[in-house]
Amino acid sequence: MKPDAHQVKQFLLNLQDTICQQLTAVDGAEFVEDSWQREAGGGGRSRVLRNGGVFEQAGVNFSHVHGEAMPASATAHRPELAGRSFEAMGVSLVVHPHNPYVPTSHANVRFFIAEKPGADPVWWFGGGFDLTPFYGFEEDAIHWHRTARDLCLPFGEDVYPRYKKWCDEYFYLKHRNEQRGIGGLFFDDLNTPDFDRCFAFMQAVGKGYTDAYLPIVERRKAMAYGERERNFQLYRRGRYVEFNLVWDRGTLFGLQTGGRTESILMSMPPLVRWEYDYQPKDGSPEAALSEFIKVRDWV
């Protein structure tokens, strides 16, 4: 089947609505919407929930940009895109909870298509979701990865192990020699076997995010915590900032190609702290995190 960008866009708009409704149902606070237009073509809807009952900040962004030609930075690695008009669309979100026992989560699903008369379109899907705990709970990690594995199974036995490995490799801070969190799924350049199958997988990932995340939120949101846990959460959020500004391809591509800065940086935690040469106490729950986030098979 020929790629249907309109069908993908409608799914993404509905996905943004659904996820915002689900997060509001857990939190009680409403999202504020900021619609924006891109001068060069396209626009989006950025939605942010701030200082809710459960979430300190949750941002759910939809964007759809298009143009007559790809930026040179994009065609340098993919010469087949030169001379083609393009559309890029996606939903991306990050949730930063108040409670340090509730992990931060991130999800993204996206579609890209480039066309020119007389030639087949070049298209692909990408996306995934990943979890960044501050305090490790094995049952949460197992639930997260089991949900990821189960949504992948209809698409093949090898899909979950492949995209889990890709996620572990992608969300890695080389300068710290540590993982950002416990991973999940990450895929890109997906265009086989055909459009329908690839689109179905992207939909499964988009819908699977809240199935994976919200039960963990419900389990942890009422746990008592104090200043020590909050300080550790703010310190570990620093890793999130470091990854996004130093290593994340999407953030760098957006900033380098004149994307909408407010939407791109919506993933940043609202509060964060750094501490020179911080060392958690031996045997403390804080010290246990470095082992917990090391790559392993959770299911």
Curated annotation (Swiss-Prot):
Entry superkingdom: Bacteria
Site-annotated residues for Important for dimerization: 175
Subcellular location: Cytoplasm
Activity modulation: Inhibited by protoporphyrinogen-IX, by metal chelator (EGTA) and by low concentrations of heavy metal ions.
Metabolic or biological pathway: Porphyrin-containing compound metabolism; protoporphyrin-IX biosynthesis; protoporphyrinogen-IX from coproporphyrinogen-III (O2 route): step 1/1
Binding site for Mn(2+): 96, 106, 145, 175
Swiss-Prot/TrEMBL keywords: Cytoplasm, Heme biosynthesis, Manganese, Metal-binding, Oxidoreductase, Porphyrin biosynthesis
One of the Pfam families matching this protein, by short name: Coprogen_oxidas
Binding site for substrate: 92, 108-110, 258-260
Reaction(s) catalysed (UniProt annotation): coproporphyrinogen III + O2 + 2 H(+) = protoporphyrinogen IX + 2 CO2 + 2 H2O
Cofactor: Mn(2+)
Major localization class: cytoplasm
Disulfide partners: none
Region of interest: Important for dimerization: 240-275
InterPro entries: Coprogen_oxidase_aer, Coprogen_oxidase_aer_sf, Coprogen_oxidase_CS
Protein's GO biological process: heme biosynthetic process; protoporphyrinogen IX biosynthetic process; protoporphyrinogen IX biosynthetic process from glutamate; response to hydroperoxide
pH-activity profile: Optimum pH is between 6 and 7.
EC number(s) from the headed UniProt entry: 1.3.3.3
Active site: 106
Homology family: Belongs to the aerobic coproporphyrinogen-III oxidase family.
NCBIfam families linked to this entry: PRK05330.1
Biological function: Involved in the heme biosynthesis. Catalyzes the aerobic oxidative decarboxylation of propionate groups of rings A and B of coproporphyrinogen-III to yield the vinyl groups in protoporphyrinogen-IX.
Description of how the protein assembles with itself and partners: Homodimer.
Protein name (Swiss-Prot/TrEMBL): Oxygen-dependent coproporphyrinogen-III oxidase
Organism in which the protein naturally occurs: Escherichia coli (strain K12)
